[in-house]
Amino acid sequence: MCIRDRDKEVEEFFYKIKFPFTIGYGMTECGPLISYAPWNEFVLGSSGKILDIMEARIYKESPEAETGEIQVRGENVMVGYYKNPEATNEVFTEDGWLRTGDLGTMDANGNIFIRGRLKTMILSSSGQNIFPEELETKLNNLPFILESLVIEYNKKLVALVYADYEALDSLGLNNPDNLKTIMDENLKNLNNSVAAYEKISKIQLYPTEFEKTPKRSIKRYLYNLSLIHISEPTRPEPI
């Protein structure tokens, strides 16, 4: 499988019932595969091993860093973007490695473990790396949450949530009191499953689906100031 949003619980379930599966990792600039492992060699939580025709390294800003950017090179890596030297220079290091923009680790056996995107990582007040995508995956598995977006707001983590209003309506639960009870319980369950520095201070309901790119990724940059528009725990009119 090559998927955008991984679900640890689903992977663990497949693994437990001995369902044969594996997960690869790649990008268009690499034609497109970077890492892969046969299902019977797949390490749970990883994205396989780097291809034989490639090299990979984890570039860390400091030796103490928990993760680093996954950088690759090899014969299947593009030479550059067509007629766009500026973008090409941005994506390659001076010594010729392609910056994937993904943060992760690599174990002694060459298995790659992806944690999140470099540009979306949040640095906690105590210096730990917070990967919003991991928290969003957990949130999206909770009752009546269709999609979510974790942002930093006033130095705290806040989850913007687009609820399953259709399901809530069908059960007669789409009112402020019920929504607050449901989301308070979701917040409690989420925070019980994450580290102290990853705890969410608030779930804030969002009135519409989040805007997405053609690849169905949320346009995160649009939502840094969304909280100033929404205050009530119910479904408001679209902004």
Give the positions of each predicted feature:
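Ser/Thr-glycine-rich phosphate-binding loops at phosphate-binding pockets of nucleotides
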Residues: 26-30, 100, 124-125, 213-215, ...
